Design a protein with these regions (language model features):
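Lipid interaction determinants
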Residues: 1, 9-187
Length: 187
């Protein structure tokens, strides 16, 4: 999750699950807008990032994945990830199932868990991050077999409580994925 500290004007991240087994962004950031550019500075000055976003047309949509339900046995698991549509570009991310991620709790690096046969490569790669540029065909993915396939954009449903769901296959089994609309609305 992105965490905004309004009092200190700092942006930080609360990451529960990620592909690697560590905090990728341990330091908060200050943000400065200059025209259509957003500059991110670390308080220690260890890095500066230039988030230059040129104006373009097309949809901008984020769906945040927060849980899945196994359709055969009804078990519900917390998950992380989501679908991002930014104009002609699409990205999908999905964390590992908890029973896989839990195997990694005693490790700081994936290669250590792999070397000790606690987890295999298929389980490591079950954390999906797939990117499609200028269309729906995946060009980059942590799951190499997904390259060339389409990101699944069909089958979304909105129930009476306003919850967005989609049935997806995870490890060859059907899960009902629960999403919430994720967007930023400036004040």
């Amino acid at each position: 999750d992105t965490v905004w500290d309004h009092a200190q004007q700092l942006l930080s991240w609360d990451v529960q699950q990620s592909y690697q087994l560590g905090i990728q962004w341990p330091e908060p950031a200050t943000l400065h807008a200059v025209g259509n550019c957003l500059l991110e500075f670390s308080p220690s000055n260890a890095y500066v990032e230039d988030w230059r976003q040129l104006s373009h047309t097309g949809p901008l949509l984020g769906l945040r994945l927060y849980q899945v339900q196994h359709l055969d046995n009804g078990e519900v698991f917390a998950m992380d990830g989501g679908l991002i549509v930014a104009g002609a570009h699409i990205a999908y991310a999905q964390s590992r199932l908890p029973q896989i991620q839990d195997k990694l709790s005693d490790f700081s690096r994936l290669d250590q868990a792999l070397a000790q046969h606690v987890i295999n490569e298929v389980e490591i790669e079950s954390y999906e991050v797939s990117v499609a540029l200028n269309g729906h065909k995946i060009q980059y993915s942590t799951q190499s077999q997904r390259v060339g396939e389409s990101i699944q954009l069909t089958g979304f449903e909105l129930n009476d409580q306003g919850i967005i769901t989609q049935i997806r296959q995870i490890h060859g089994e059907d899960y009902l994925c629960y999403f919430q609309l994720d967007l930023y609305q400036p004040e």
